[in-house]
A protein has these predicted regions:
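Active-site mouth loops of central-metabolism enzymes
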Residues: 1-16, 98-106
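Structural preference for beta-strand elements that scaffold enzyme active sites
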Residues: 3-5, 30-33, 61-63, 77-79, ...
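Glycine-rich phosphate-binding active-site loops on the catalytic face of alpha/beta enzymes
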Residues: 6, 82-90, 123-135, 166, ...
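Short secondary-structure boundary segments
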Residues: 10, 36, 82, 104-106, ...
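Acidic (Asp/Glu)-rich catalytic clusters
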Residues: 20-28, 52-57, 72, 91-94, ...
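Alpha-helix-loop-beta-strand connector modules within alpha/beta enzyme cores
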Residues: 47-66, 88-107, 137-163, 198-203
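Catalytic cores of alpha/beta
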Residues: 62-77, 90, 106-120, 150, ...
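Glycine/Thr-rich beta-alpha phosphate-binding loop at enzyme active sites
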Residues: 73-75, 80, 102-149, 186-188, ...
Length: 203
């Protein structure tokens, strides 16, 4: 599990689907996460169904942010924040073998617990300041270096990551770089080249 971890943005769904299709078609997206905080709960299942079809078409693992019930409805993996319930509970409700990730902020102790509970990967951030979560602060790369030395599961970095600033993050030990705006903040035409630029960082 290594490479670009793409997270959805708040574009209108048709535009988002177009962007996701060209991004996933590159064959260089490691995981896609559904995160649509501004979309009403009642509208989310139909969006997930459409995006799930794209992920199946391009053979990209698909996970749901925060919402275990939604993940369970579609038999998908889930990414859980610290306040989104226990990993063991998620593992009991989801199909065997799906991805279960955990936000660990800047804490190796939280990561240790998550891994003991069965997390597939652990995420640290925000590495850099970010408009998506301005309250998250920036943890820098030292915690990623330490996590890489301590843990066998993939380390995911998140927060303000771009092609230009992420080489050091990957060299520090991040197997996954979670990104929203550096891909989906661009036009559909620009996305494939940007995804490819990311992929070269992981070579």
């Amino acid at each position: 599990m290594r490479g670009l971890y793409l997270i959805t943005n708040d574009d209108p769904i048709q535009l988002l689907l177009e962007k996701l299709d060209v991004a996933l078609a590159t064959g260089q997206i490691a995981i896609l996460q559904y995160r649509r905080k501004k979309i009403a709960k009642i509208d989310q299942p139909s969006e997930v169904e459409q995006i799930k079809a794209l992920c199946e078409k391009h053979q990209v693992p698909f996970v749901i942010n925060d919402d275990l019930a939604l993940a369970e409805q579609f038999g998908l993996g889930v990414h859980l924040g610290q306040s989104d319930g226990e990993i063991s509970h998620a593992a009991a409700r989801l199909p065997k073998g799906v991805i279960i990730g955990r936000t660990c902020l800047n804490s190796l102790e939280l990561a240790k617990k998550a891994i003991a509970d069965g997390a597939t990967y652990v995420a640290f951030g925000a590495v850099y300041a970010t408009s998506t979560k301005p309250e998250a602060g920036n943890v820098g790369i030292e915690v990623i270096k330490q996590a890489k030395q301590k843990f066998a599961v993939p380390i995911c970095a998140i927060g303000g990551l771009t092609v230009e600033n992420s080489q050091v993050v990957i060299e520090a030990g991040a197997s996954l770089c979670a990104v929203i705006s550096d891909i989906l903040g661009r036009s559909t035409a620009e996305i494939p080249a940007r995804v490819t630029a990311w992929a070269t960082l992981f070579d």
